[in-house]
Amino acid sequence: MMPMNPKQLKKLMKQLDMKQLDGVKEVIIKLENKEIVIKEPVVTVIRAMGEKMYQIAGGTEEERVVLKISEEDIKLVMEQAGVDYETAKKALEEAGGDLAEAILRLTDQ
């Protein structure tokens, strides 16, 4: 591909109805069991056939596992350890969702 000067690039972007979003700090793509976090990306919005498409490029990528903790699990930890909702939830998160580990951590304090 031949290099383009900035003026030609702006003209082409206008013809394709492309606009760059400024000030984007991060983009999070949420999957069923994890999140992909792209920090400091370059995000371009493209309009074609009545649809908006977002192109995300560059940046630092990290994956985070999303832990799903059920209300039943939180209530069980609350009852067994004699703690409030937030304490039980935090203990479950720290224990990676392991009920026994969360209860042991709370009762061994």
Swiss-Prot record:
Annotated NAC-A/B domain residues: 3-69
Entry keyword RNA-binding: yes
GO molecular-function terms, A-Z: RNA binding
Keywords: Protein transport, RNA-binding, Transport
Pfam family, one: NAC
GO BP annotations, alphabetical order: protein transport
NCBIfam families per UniProt: archaeal-type nascent polypeptide-associated complex protein
Record note on quaternary structure: Homodimer. Interacts with the ribosome. Binds ribosomal RNA.
Family of the protein in this entry: Belongs to the NAC-alpha family.
Role according to the record: Contacts the emerging nascent chain on the ribosome.
Protein name per the record: Nascent polypeptide-associated complex protein
Organism for this UniProt entry: Pyrococcus abyssi (strain GE5 / Orsay)
Organism classification: Archaea, Methanobacteriati, Methanobacteriota, Thermococci, Thermococcales
